[in-house]
Design a protein with these regions (language model features):
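Active-site HxH/HxHxD metal-binding segment of metal-dependent hydrolases
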Residues: 109-176
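Conserved beta-strand hairpin/beta-sheet module of binuclear metal-dependent hydrolase folds
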Residues: 69-118, 190-203, 209
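Core dinuclear metal-dependent hydrolase active-site scaffold
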Residues: 93-96, 165-195
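DNA major-groove recognition helix of helix-turn-helix/homeodomain DNA-binding modules
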Residues: 46-61
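A short, Lys/Arg-rich alpha-helix, primarily the initiator
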Residues: 1-17
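Short alpha-helical DNA-recognition segment
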Residues: 17-35
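Metallo-beta-lactamase
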Residues: 109, 120, 184-253
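Short amphipathic recognition helices of helix-turn-helix/homeodomain-type DNA-binding modules
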Residues: 59-73
């Protein structure tokens, strides 16, 4: 299940472009009532195609958003830990390569994460990397630090600092930080090198089928610029590990 359905994609784009539903409707040749009905869950591929150019979205992708699901992840080295968060979920990602284990983010409360790690026979990962300081990503961090796990992040209490462009070598893996601010400020993505394919942990900057919400139009444009800057050089087969929802690939997005 995607983190955002088509109504959230619409609302995030409208907010990011400082457009009202009426303004978007007028520019797209639609009625305001059609756009409002779409925003409330009445999907229409035709309306999606009409709105997409106004919202700077891919028309074919937006028209298909109601059916879109990325291909399932089939890598034994990467495990999605699906953790509860309010009425939804949040991800932690466990990455194993030979004797090296990494954890990306830690959920909102420690108990479900610690239980999952114990069940996976990995109570103490070799290192933790935190994408950003929102509460649903750092809740398990203090307990894991107390277990002796080194943690890395940017402006996150208890972590060793890592800045965009810097890297850390953990066992067989190299983790390189990049700037994915916009939804959160600061916010890091983590390139993970040494696996069988390129991997980028995106936090809440990018989900399958959408991006993280931004507080202002300026931050929305900033977020898009940082995503383009980070993603453009990467090969299409790059695996993307988001903070919510399923893993995806650069080619899929």
């Amino acid at each position: 299940m995607l983190e955002d359905d088509f109504t959230y994609v619409l609302r995030k784009a409208l907010k990011g472009l400082a457009l009202s539903p009426g303004e978007a409707a007028s520019r797209a040749g639609l009625t305001e009532n059609e756009v409002l009905a779409f925003s409330r869950g009445l999907f229409s591929a035709e309306i999606a195609r009409s709105l997409a150019p106004i919202l700077h979205l891919n028309p074919a992708a937006f028209a298909n958003h109601n059916q879109y699901q990325p291909q399932p992840l089939h890598l034994h080295t990467i495990r999605r830990i699906d953790l509860p968060f309010e009425d939804g979920q949040v991800n932690a990602w466990l990455i194993r390569e030979d004797d090296t284990t990494l954890l990306i983010d830690t959920g909102i409360t420690p108990q479900p994460l610690l239980a999952a790690l114990d069940a996976l026979a990995c109570p103490k990962p070799d290192a933790i990397f935190i994408t950003h300081a929102h509460r649903d990503h750092i809740g398990g961090l203090p307990e894991l630090i107390a277990r002796g796990c080194p943690a890395f992040g940017h402006e996150i209490p208890g972590t060793q600092p890592i800045l965009p462009g810097q890297s850390r070598r953990i066992g067989q893996l190299t983790i390189r930080a990049c700037d994915l601010s916009g939804h959160a400020n600061p916010s890091l993505g983590f390139h993970i090198e040494g696996l069988t394919r390129p991997v980028l942990a995106t936090g809440d900057a990018l989900f399958a089928g959408s991006i993280g919400g931004c507080a202002t139009p300026a931050l929305y444009q900033h977020a898009l610029a940082k995503l383009r800057e980070t993603l453009t050089p990467l090969p299409p087969r790059t695996l993307l590990l988001p903070g919510h929802g399923p893993a995806t690939t650069l080619s899929g997005e």
